[in-house]
Every structure is written in structure tokens, then in C-alpha cells.
Regions:
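Short beta-strand elements
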Residues: 1-25, 36
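Low-complexity, Pro/Thr/Ser/Gly/Ala-rich linker/spacer regions in secreted
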Residues: 2, 178-190
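Short beta-strands within extracellular/lumenal beta-sheet-rich domains
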Residues: 26-39, 99
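Extended extracellular/luminal ectodomain segments enriched in beta-structured repeat modules
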Residues: 39-49, 59
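Aromatic- and Gly/Pro-enriched, solvent-exposed loop/edge beta-strand patches characteristic
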Residues: 60-142
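Short, surface-exposed beta-strand/loop patches at domain edges
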Residues: 120-181
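C-terminal outer-membrane/trafficking sorting elements
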Residues: 187-225
Length: 225
């Protein structure tokens, strides 16, 4: 739909709304919500653009995912191989009812003549739910897919506890973004998200965060002490 965006959904309606949504993470849900794209040129994927439903909870986490696809084998029979994923993205209040770009740490190489399954993955959480918008209908069965990562689907008793693929007819509002500027902007964000002082330190240090948010932090001593 532009020089950098590859999309299949119908976008929002005249009022700026999608025609539905799908939960990807919440108290009883951890789904991969994906759609299939065929490539007609070699490109580098820098991010996925997705519509965050206003039913989502600010603070919920999601991530962008890319699968390499074997179109001769169904997803359920092993036709998808996880190729890459982004770091976790925390939904903000400003993201609700809006499009957001979720960048990959490094560009993902995609090749002419190959098919890929791209989408958004959520996480089980007792209170923080994440919903992705839907707009339009599939052209064929298997064009859009759901992966129940932990077999949590209460409507599929036979596969309880078993990771399971399904197809659905609603089109995920997930788009490929090949804009090269996403790479540098993500790098800058990672560099300025916090400040550590004093440096050097005697073992006690202060971490000053750039904004109020939920963070996961790991401290490693590279000297092995």
C-alpha cells in the first residue's frame, strides 16, 4: 500500500475502527496470530505494523514473529519454521486503537519466490490482555493462522496442553514494513532508554530509567567475577 508497507487487510472503516479483533494474550490465552505473504523480490523486513485494539490493556506485552513457510505442508504437519522474532513490546495507552510498528533488532532477510507467515504473539498474564484488530476475510483456508502455543484453547478438549495450529477466516491487521529507517531508530531507542552511574563503579551503581514503564533487567559481570 506504499513504498515500504506490504498489507492484506482492509484497514479501518470510515470511523477509524476495525471490523473485529482477536485476543493474543491474557489470563487464558497465548496465541500466535499470523498471516501468509508471498515474496516477489528480495527484501529486508525491519518491522511489523499492527493495529492494537482498544480492548487491550496498557502494559500488556506482545512481540512480532516471522515463520519461514513450506506451502506443500500444512502448518500442523510442520510446514512452518520460526525464522525470527522481535524483543517484547509493551503496549502503551497511546497505542490503544492505533497502528504501531514493532521493530526487529536486525533486519530479517526475505527472498523472492518464498512464502512467509508473519504475525503477533501474546503472553499469558493474569490481568494484561492484548487484542489485535481484524479487517476483511481470507481468500482461502490457511491464509491466516492461529498457533495455540500451550494448548490452552477450551474449545478443543482433544488438544488440551498440546501446541496446536488452526486456520481462521478473519484477516489479521498485521503488515510487513520494509522501511530502513526503522533499524536506526530502534538502535537509538535502545541506547537511550537508561543511564547507569557512576561509571566505573565499585559494585554499587544507580540505573536511571528514561520513562515510567515495565522493564525486565539482567545484570552480568563480563569479567566473570
Amino acid at each position: 500500500i506504499s513504498d515500504y508497507i506490504y498489507a492484506k487487510d482492509n484497514g479501518t472503516d470510515i470511523n477509524g475502527d476495525p471490523d473485529g479483533n482477536w485476543i493474543v494474550g491474557g489470563p487464558d490465552d497465548q496465541w500466535h496470530f499470523t498471516t501468509r505473504f508471498e515474496m516477489y523480490a528480495d527484501e529486508q523486513l525491519t518491522s511489523l505494523r499492527t493495529y492494537i485494539s482498544d480492548e487491550s490493556v496498557a502494559g500488556a506485552e506482545i512481540k512480532a514473529i516471522v515463520y519461514e513457510l513450506d506451502t506443500t505442508i500444512s502448518n500442523a504437519d510442520g510446514g512452518v519454521i520460526l525464522l525470527n522474532e522481535s524483543d517484547n513490546y509493551t503496549i502503551t495507552a497511546q497505542d490503544l486503537g492505533a497502528w504501531v510498528d514493532i521493530p526487529f533488532a536486525d533486519p530479517v532477510d526475505l527472498y523472492n519466490g518464498y512464502a512467509y507467515e508473519v504475525g503477533i504473539a501474546g503472553f499469558v498474564h493474569p490481568t494484561d490482555s492484548a487484542f489485535i484488530g481484524t479487517s476483511g476475510q481470507s481468500m482461502y483456508n490457511g491464509e491466516h493462522s492461529l498457533f495455540d502455543e500451550f494448548g490452552l484453547n477450551p474449545n478443543d478438549v482433544a488438544n488440551q496442553g498440546i501446541p496446536t495450529w488452526y486456520y481462521l477466516t478473519r484477516t489479521p491487521m498485521v503488515r510487513m514494513n520494509f522501511d530502513p529507517s526503522n533499524v536506526s531508530s530502534f538502535y537509538d531507542m535502545k541506547q537511550t532508554i537508561f543511564t547507569i552511574y557512576p561509571n566505573p563503579t565499585n559494585g554499587i551503581f544507580i540505573i536511571e530509567l528514561g520513562e515510567v514503564a515495565k522493564y525486565d533487567m539482567t545484570v552480568n559481570n563480563v569479567l566473570g567475577q
